[in-house]
């Protein structure tokens, strides 16, 4: 079995295959494992996450017990901290004006749920307003949550996401957590997959190695 990418999903797949004693190769284009989970350490030594940082839906997030197992510190919090403020057209956006953002967000959620209930598997961009007052802001949050643009996110992924409103930051760094957890997995680093050929005779991968 070939697993492409040594992010959290790829590492989990490799661990599952190893547990079943199924031969596999794990191919990673980068020089490290972890994908978007990447922690760096500035001169002051404090961990700084360049990618993901929060364990969302903490009570059902499998990385919470993993963090406990590897003694990686995290903080149990009730919220994200100070609320975001928006600056537009040279001035701060008022709370009253932000009501339209909440309304547009709710409209998008309803449109996504309605399309999915009809058996339509489209991208977020295809079923939501593209010229709304807050489209760019909502697109920003979609990308922030999924790491891809709205035209690449399936509405099925959005609907299936279970949000418990428990969001805990990883104090020692999410990248460090994933790195520790995946350190025992055999992986071929600096091995980018350039092409996948899938036919009657099987699957063939072209890599840089």
What are these regions (language model features)?
Residues 1-209:
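FAD-dinucleotide binding site
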């Amino acid at each position: 079995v070939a697993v492409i990418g040594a992010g959290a999903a790829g590492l989990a797949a490799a661990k599952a295959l190893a547990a079943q004693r199924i031969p596999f190769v794990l191919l990673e284009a980068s020089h490290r494992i972890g994908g978007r989970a990447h922690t760096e350490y500035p001169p002051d030594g404090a961990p700084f996450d360049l990618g993901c940082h929060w364990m969302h839906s903490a009570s059902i997030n499998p990385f919470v017990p993993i963090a406990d197992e590897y003694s990686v510190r995290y903080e149990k919090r009730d919220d994200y901290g100070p609320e975001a403020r928006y600056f537009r057209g040279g001035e701060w956006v008022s709370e009253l004006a932000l009501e339209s953002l909440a309304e547009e967000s709710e409209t998008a959620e309803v449109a996504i749920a309605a399309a999915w209930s009809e058996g339509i598997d489209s991208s977020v961009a295809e079923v939501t307003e593209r010229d709304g007052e807050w489209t760019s802001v909502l697109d920003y949050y979609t990308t922030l949550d999924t790491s891809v643009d709205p035209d690449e996110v399936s509405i099925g992924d959005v609907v299936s996401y279970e949000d418990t409103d428990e969001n805990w930051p990883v104090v020692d760094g999410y990248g460090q957590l994933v790195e520790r957890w995946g350190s025992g997995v055999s992986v071929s680093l600096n091995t980018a997959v350039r092409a996948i050929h899938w036919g009657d005779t099987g699957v063939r991968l072209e890599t840089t190695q």
